[in-house]
A protein has these predicted regions:
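Left-handed beta-helix
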Residues: 1-42, 68-69, 82, 87, ...
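N-terminal glycine-rich phosphate-binding loop and ensuing alpha1 helix
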Residues: 2-96, 128-196, 201-211
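Short helix/loop capping segments that flank catalytic or ligand/cofactor-binding pockets
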Residues: 45-46, 148-150, 204-206, 227-229, ...
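Stable alpha-helical structural segments in soluble proteins, enriched in small hydrophobic residues
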Residues: 86, 178, 617, 621-625, ...
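Intrinsically disordered, low-complexity terminal tails and inter-domain linkers enriched
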Residues: 95-131
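Conserved core of the sugar-phosphate nucleotidyltransferase
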Residues: 134, 153-154, 160-196, 200-297, ...
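DPxDG-like acidic metal-binding loop motif
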Residues: 155, 159-160, 773-795
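C-terminal nucleotide
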Residues: 519-754, 795, 804-816, 822-956, ...
């Protein structure tokens, strides 16, 4: 990157930073007035809407007074006439004689109307006499009809897009770039007016500007003479002022006239001119009565700011030559009379030449130039932060796109530019096209075509179509001669919708664009355009693009915290409603729609910072599982108590590999893989469920662990199983899951017990194991209840059915979690437990083929250590699930890796390599810590550290954070040695070894 480019890049950044500061600090120097000129009232309305939008979104300094002035009475009065109209507006506004329209933001607008009052110069008030004193005024002439780029006729070229994201995340426009680039100029002048042309973007450093004197100052930039021959050039006199104006001279002529410096460069006219207060007062003297105003501001004179106001300021100018200067309109007597007065008022002033270098300007000229700028020419402006793709879902580099959704199944040709449009599946756009403001749904657009949609004031639509190289001033369309200039040819059909208008225009193209009786031209469609519809369409499309981009990221399961950045921290009610409406329509029993639904809600929780959307996400997961789980639930009125009493005792489980992969929604989207083992403690199965007959018509539930027992005679009490603080929630869920009582249906307890043949007593306990052990006791206890009830009823139950009943119980209880715990205790031995990706999980259990010798070695080297602390309740499940749903890369990677390690663990055990298994256990421990930093704490770390030299492998049980720890001892190390070490360090604090044995 050259030094010049680096300078401009940093200057651009400095201006952007300064502008952000001005937005938040009104005490910094800023423009007192920003005035835009417009060609007619319709265009003025469009400009006002644009400025109101920016004020509403805090994109403009509120302290500045903004005015949009159309040419008076709708007449084309030229840029000079428009400038005089600005001066009169400011003078009358200062005097309080203007009757402004007030917009909701409280900002006052000029309406451009000529007020028939007594001449202001008659008895001017004090404020009017000094209207320009101390005022910094920015005027942007933007009243053209944009014939050379018709797609911007309605919105105005001034508000045409610039391919840069503003600091607030919105797409920039030429106007926004003006405000940023010129914000520093206000501080470089004490008072006066800066006049700019609305179709040229200047890139410069405001620190190179100083203007505190009388007269005017022209801002120029250095360019090679070869470029200067196509532009206006200033010739500098000996005093450093503008000596003359040279317009589109050859390189030889520029040399002959002394305009070329020793480096072969000329001073390019940028269209930006600064004027002092004295000069403004002199200009105002030309229109200080109604009669004078009418004489100077009219269609006959059609004064040009550049030809009529600046020429007299050049030191080498003459009145005779001034009369011959090419006018903006025609040579008329009215123009000659005005020039005589202007010469007398201005010729005594000088115009300083301010040379800015390094500097550059970008001219938004013709459609072809625009297309080049937005595609192939983009590279030369990337240092300014310009991008070929702005607010679009498309990442294709062969074409440019701004504020557009382009289907992945649409085909866009190289070198094309798509803006403010929606391209559906099957759409084909040829090479080098400009597509603007339309919806294409499967149509084909030929190469080198402009297609631009407009809403008209009667709520109908027109789509204008012409060649990229067509000149609307000429009588040709797509290279074919037509009867009148394209600008006025009524060849475009009008339809009720934009889609119908697209189809009708494409048919007209195929028919050779015949003149239509009810057709409309470029000119008339511009004049009849509903300018108030432009911003809402762009906003609506911007929302649509962001929504579709988010949905694409959701469907790819990308990181949602990155994906939501497309909204730049802002989300409006319309987007929220659309996303919620979309989510509500999705079927959570269909896997793709389920995945999309939960992530839409999660994205909304990120965007709105509201927990209710995260709750909806988690509720959707629970509901999806619950619907599948309770699908087979039914009350069995034929069930009978076949035995007096049934007691079921089960082992606990230890988790080795893959834990968390069994947790919804991960297992639903990817399947789960878990390696675990059933374990006895002190030779006993500690999980117990007892079912027995009791006399009477009651159902009695008991929890030996909590010492609670209660008789129930109301069915509604038994059906309420979702209260996590209810000591009998598990018992109630077991009765529902096994068909003892109905899930929802109302029936009396008396009828239930009558059908059973007696009352029922269900008791549970976990013998001598502390709560929060991490050994899966809650799920295994649920399995014990199901086994006991089915055995009491004399029913056969397969392992798969058993797993499903327990899953059903856990969903009824709303406990969430995965399926590995119950399988760990219900199926004997060491096994690999798996499931495929599906909403309804089908669990497969495959016993590991482990030799007797390996199992014996494991029993000798494996032991459990109680940490002496109960695992604290945490929102762990919510946290892990949220991070997975969000697409957190680290979480997703860990969940994949722990499954891979589970498979490798099985391999090592089946090969008899306990040392290899121990190393994998250590790797899993590190992954568990990555997934959840709360799985360990100072106490757990200290326990592991204290026995580090005695063990080869370590791991937590369950989610960790307390409860039991598991270790693989080094060969030759005994359990007693570990116990002794723990006693030495922790004494009798409860940290100790528990004897255990793997169930074969």
């Amino acid at each position: 990157m050259s030094y010049q480019t680096l300078f401009l890049q940093q200057s651009y950044r400095d201006c952007t930073k300064q502008y952000e500061e001005i937005l938040h600090n009104p005490n910094l120097p800023l423009w007192d007035y920003v005035v835009l000129t417009a060609s007619n009232e319709a265009q003025a309305q469009a400009y006002r809407a644009q400025i109101s939008y920016r004020l509403k979104h805090q994109m403009l300094p509120e302290k500045t007074h903004y005015a949009v002035l159309p040419d008076p009475d709708g007449k084309r009065v030229g840029s000079g006439g428009a400038t005089l109209n600005v001066l009169r507006y400011i003078r009358e506004h200062a005097a309080g004689t203007k009757s402004p329209a007030v917009v909701p933001s409280g900002v006052v607008w000029g309406d451009g109307a000529v007020e028939r009052r007594q001449p202001v110069s008659g008895q001017p008030g004090e404020a009017a006499c000094h209207a320009f004193d101390g005022k910094r005024i920015l005027v942007i002439h933007s009243g053209g009809d944009s014939k050379r780029v018709p797609q911007y006729s309605a919105c105005g070229k001034l508000f045409s897009p610039v391919p840069r994201i503003l600091p607030n995340g919105r797409r920039s426009t030429l106007f926004d770039e003006f405000m940023i680039a010129m914000c520093g100029v206000a501080a470089r002048m004490n008072a006066g007016m800066l006049v700019c042309s609305g179709d040229v973007l200047l890139l410069f450093n405001p620190l190179q500007i100083d203007f505190y004197g009388k007269g005017a100052a022209a801002l120029s930039i250095k360019e090679p003479a070869e470029i200067g021959k196509n532009h206006g050039v200033y010739r500098r006199d000996r005093e450093g002022n503008v000596g003359g104006f040279l317009h589109k001279k050859t390189v030889e002529q520029l040399h002959e006239m002394g305009a070329v410096d020793e480096h072969g460069h000329v001073d390019i006219d940028t269209g930006a001119v600064m004027m002092s207060v004295d000069l403004l007062n002199s200009l105002y003297s030309l229109i200080d009565t109604e009669e004078k105003f009418a004489a100077c501001v009219n269609e006959q004179a059609r004064l040009s700011f550049y030809a009529d106001f600046l020429y007299p300021l050049a030191s080498d100018s003459t009145l005779e030559q001034y009369y011959q200067e090419t006018p903006e309109g025609e040579f008329t007597l009215e123009l000659r009379a005005c020039r005589e007065k202007i010469w007398a008022a201005l010729h005594s002033y000088q115009m300083k030449l301010i040379r800015m270098s390094p500097a550059a300007f970008i001219h938004f000229g013709t459609t072809r130039e625009l297309l080049h700028l937005m595609t192939e020419g983009m590279e030369q402006f990337t240092h300014l932060g310009w991008q070929a793709r702005i607010n679009t879902n498309s990442q294709e580099k062969s074409y440019g796109a701004g504020n557009s959704y382009i289907s992945l199944r649409a085909d866009v040709g190289a070198g094309s530019y798509i803006e403010d449009s929606y391209l559906h599946h099957g759409t084909v756009v040829g090479e080098r096209c400009v597509i603007s403001g339309v919806t294409l749904d499967g149509q084909s657009v030929p190469a080198d075509t402009v297609l631009h949609g407009l809403k008209l004031q009667d709520d109908r639509f027109v789509v204008r179509m012409y060649g990229v190289c067509d000149n609307p001033k000429e009588a040709a369309l797509f290279g074919k001669k037509i009867g009148e200039p394209l600008w006025t040819a009524a060849v475009y059909p009008i339809r009720n919708t934009i889609q119908e208008a697209v189809s009708a225009t494409l048919r007209a193209y195929e028919d050779g664009f015949p003149t239509l009786e009810d057709g409309i031209s470029l000119k008339d469609s511009f004049n009849q355009a509903d300018v108030t519809a432009i911003l809402p369409w762009q906003d609506k499309l911007e929302d649509k693009v962001k929504i579709e981009s988010l949905l694409e990221a959701i469907d790819k399961k990308d990181n949602l915290h990155e994906a939501v950045k497309v909204f730049n921290g802002e989300i409006n009610g319309r987007v929220i409603r659309q996303l919620c409406g979309l989510a509500e329509k999705l079927d959570e029993q269909e896997l793709f729609e389920f995945s999309r639904k939960i992530r839409i809600y999660y994205a909304l929780s990120c965007l709105t910072k509201q927990d209710k959307y995260l709750d909806l996400c988690l509720d959707t997961i629970r509901n999806a599982i619950l619907v599948g789980a309770v699908a087979g639930l039914s009350y069995d009125s034929t069930a009978k108590m076949e035995q007096e009493e049934v007691v079921v005792r089960l082992p606990v489980r230890v988790n080795w590999g893959g834990g968390w992969s069994d947790t919804p929604p991960y297992c639903m989207e990817h399947g789960g893989t878990v390696l675990n083992a059933a374990v006895k403690l002190d030779g006993q199965n500690p999980v117990e469920a007892v079912v027995k007959k009791i006399p009477g018509n009651q159902i009695v539930l008991a929890s030996a662990d909590s010492g609670a027992e209660q008789a129930f005679s109301e069915i509604s009490q038994l059906q309420d199983s979702s209260n996590p603080y209810d000591p009998f929630a598990l018992h109630k869920a077991a009765l529902i899951a096994c068909g003892i009582i109905p899930y929802r249906e109302q029936i009396s307890v008396e009828e239930v017990t009558k059908n059973l043949g007696s009352g029922l007593y269900l008791s549970t306990q976990v013998i001598h194991i502390p709560r929060g052990s991490g050994l899966g006791t809650s799920s295994i206890l649920a399995g014990a209840c199901v086994k006991a009830i089915y055995r009491m009823l004399g029913k056969e139950l397969s392992q798969e059915e058993l797993y499903n009943r327990v899953l059903c119980m856990e969903q009824i209880m709303s406990t969430g979690g995965g399926w590995q715990d119950q399988v760990g205790g219900l199926a004997p031995g060491i096994k690999m437990v798996t499931s495929d990706a599906a909403i309804v999980q089908e669990i497969g259990c495959s016993p590991c083929s482990i030799s007797t010798e390996t199992l014996q070695e494991l029993n000798e080297r494996f032991c459990l250590i109680y940490s002496g602390q109960r695992r604290l309740a945490r929102n762990l499940l919510r946290d892990i699930v949220s991070r997975y749903v969000s697409g957190n890369p680290d979480t997703v990677e860990v969940l994949y890796e722990i499954q891979r390690i589970a498979v490798l663990m099985r391999f090592e055990l089946e090969k008899g390599n306990v040392d290899g298994f121990a190393q994998l256990l250590n790797q899993h421990w590190e992954l568990s810590r990555r997934l959840d930093g709360g799985c360990t704490n100072t106490c757990i770390d200290m326990i592991f550290s204290s026995v580090e030299d005695l063990i080869d492998g370590k791991m937590i049980c369950g989610a960790g954070g307390g409860g039991f720890l598991q270790v693989i001892l080094k060969k030759g190390v005994t359990v007693e040695q570990v116990q002794k070490r723990l006693r030495e360090v922790f004494q009798d604090s409860g940290v100790e070894v528990w004897r255990c044995s793997l169930v074969g």
